[in-house]
């Protein structure tokens, strides 16, 4: 009996020992800290991809269960090495095919549907390649080869754009962009403005000189008639539009007075080139009636004075001294008052001249005067020609000066009376009268500029200054 119990215990011990040999227990307690450390640390992406591929291989091709094998770690390591080798091979193949950054950008943009508009623009025949060359440079601050412009080039380019577009806002937009980007400071912006203004003045002067050279070239009568007055425009509606636009954009006044204004004043005013004066019917009719060649100088003086007053009214509207509606009303009064008073003065001079020079007119002249109204007007023009002080003989220089001065004083007296009338009737809504100090400074500057350009004589400019200083 004791032997039986002994044999039973031996069999039990053998059963307990045999699984240990057939199924070895992994040393989990030793690898646990290493396993936790691997989980907490971030492994390289290539290693994670290789491990994932190894797991795929395991699932797809499970290892064969051979009876003699008790541990598959060797098979796992082999599969892992194969996956890593294949991954490295794929990486090398990708690196061997090099794609330029621009091509890569195009591929990405091809996928992005929001970029299709740029591709459509590429097929637009109206757009040049230079327009798309620097798409992040809308102000054109690069040369054709892509190199940045120098400071002088930028100043020249800004001034040219302002001159071509007749828009002072071009400078403001560019400078505000540079200030927002932090590329320039406030003081540098003021310096840039002065430099651009200087270059812009040179461009205007150059254009004016070119225009004068073209005028000096002989042209046929047919060519000179091509620049006649365009189709009829409602005068005050056009002026009202100009003032209304000026409220929304202060560059309108600059456009009228800076580029076109200075260019106008440097021109020799011909009979068919009165520009905006056609919007003043009374004054324009007066100019058309003064068509004597010997009165051309007085005619140019009258045009210059009228344009100066127009610019002055525009300046008052720009700085808010008067409203656009009041500006239109003032211009209407200028048109009516100056034209009427100047015409009366000229007619009086012509009548006095006729009574002095032709106290006993001949029968021939009497018949011609009574024949038709056209002939009578022609005779009056001839009398006015004889009265022209600028064409008198040199034997009476003092008389010539007095007559010339009297003609100019007649114009200026009409202007003075008109401004006095405006001052008396500008009392609505407690608005201030004209700022006469600004007015005098403005007129003095314009008169000096006209003398330099040869539009006015020194004596005429002094007379204008004297009239305005006495207001």
Curated annotation (Swiss-Prot):
It is a peripheral membrane protein. GO terms for cellular component: extracellular region; secretory granule membrane; transport vesicle membrane. The modification Phosphoserine is found at residues 40, 365. Residues 1-22 form the signal peptide. The keyword Glycoprotein applies. It comes from the Eukaryota. InterPro entries: SCG3. It is found in: Cytoplasmic vesicle, Secretory vesicle; Cytoplasmic vesicle, Secretory vesicle membrane; Secreted. Glycans are attached at residues 40, 71, 353. Residues 32-45, 86-96, 363-409 have a biased composition (Basic and acidic residues). Keywords: Cleavage on pair of basic residues, Cytoplasmic vesicle, Glycoprotein, Membrane, Phosphoprotein, Proteoglycan, Secreted, Signal. The keyword Transcription does not apply. Residues 23-72, 86-105, 357-409 are annotated as: Disordered. One of its GO terms (biological process) is protein localization to secretory granule. Transmembrane segments: none annotated. Its main location: cytoplasm. Member of the granin protein family that regulates the biogenesis of secretory granules. Acts as a sorting receptor for intragranular proteins including chromogranin A/CHGA. May also play a role in angiogenesis. Promotes endothelial proliferation, migration and tube formation through MEK/ERK signaling pathway. Interacts with CHGA. Interacts with secretogranin II/SCG2. Interacts (via C-terminus) with CPE. This is Secretogranin-3. It comes from Bos taurus (Bovine).
């Amino acid at each position: 009996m004791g032997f039986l119990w002994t044999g039973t215990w031996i069999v039990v011990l053998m059963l307990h020992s045999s699984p240990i040999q057939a199924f070895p227990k992994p040393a989990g307690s030793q690898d646990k800290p290493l396993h936790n450390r691997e989980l907490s640390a971030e492994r390289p992406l290539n290693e994670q991809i290789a491990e994932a591929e190894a797991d795929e291989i395991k699932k797809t091709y499970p290892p064969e269960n051979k009876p003699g094998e008790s541990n598959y770690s060797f098979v796992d390591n082999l599969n892992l090495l194969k996956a890593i080798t294949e991954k490295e091979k794929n990486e090398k193949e990708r690196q061997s095919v090099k794609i330029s950054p621009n091509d890569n950008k195009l591929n990405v943009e091809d996928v992005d549907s929001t970029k299709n508009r740029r591709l459509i623009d590429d097929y637009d025949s109206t757009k040049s390649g230079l327009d798309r060359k620097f798409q992040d440079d809308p102000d054109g601050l690069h040369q054709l080869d892509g190199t940045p412009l120098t400071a002088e080039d930028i100043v020249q380019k800004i001034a040219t754009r302002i001159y071509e577009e007749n828009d002072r806002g071009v400078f403001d937009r560019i400078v505000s962009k540079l200030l927002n980007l932090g590329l320039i400071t406030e003081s540098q912006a003021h310096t840039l403005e002065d430099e651009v203004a200087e270059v812009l003045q040179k461009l205007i002067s150059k254009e004016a000189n070119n225009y004068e050279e073209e005028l000096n070239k002989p042209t046929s009568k047919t060519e000179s008639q091509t620049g006649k007055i365009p189709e009829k425009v409602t005068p005050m509606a056009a002026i009202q539009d100009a003032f209304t636009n000026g409220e929304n954009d202060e560059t309108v006044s600059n456009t009228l007075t800076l580029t076109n204004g200075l260019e106008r004043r440097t021109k020799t005013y011909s009979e068919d080139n009165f520009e905006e004066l056609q919007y003043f019917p009374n004054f324009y009719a007066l100019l058309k009636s003064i068509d004597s060649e010997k009165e051309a100088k007085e005619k140019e003086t009258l045009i210059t004075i009228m344009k100066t007053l127009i610019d002055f009214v525009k300046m008052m509207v720009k700085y808010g001294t008067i409203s656009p509606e009041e500006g239109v009303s003032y211009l209407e009064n200028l048109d009516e008052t100056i034209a009427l008073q100047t015409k009366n003065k000229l007619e009086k001079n012509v009548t006095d001249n006729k009574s002095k020079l032709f106290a006993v007119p001949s029968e021939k002249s009497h018949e011609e005067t009574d024949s038709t109204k056209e002939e009578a007007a022609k005779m009056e023009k001839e009398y006015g020609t004889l009265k022209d002080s600028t064409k008198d003989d040199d034997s009476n220089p003092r008389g010539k000066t007095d007559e010339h001065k009297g003609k100019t004083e007649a114009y200026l007296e009409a202007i003075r009376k008109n401004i006095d009338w405006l001052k008396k009737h500008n009392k609505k809504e407690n608005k201030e009268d004209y700022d006469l100090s600004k007015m005098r400074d403005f007129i003095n500057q314009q008169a000096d500029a006209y003398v330099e350009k040869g539009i006015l004589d020194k004596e005429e400019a002094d007379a204008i200054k004297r009239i305005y200083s006495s207001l």
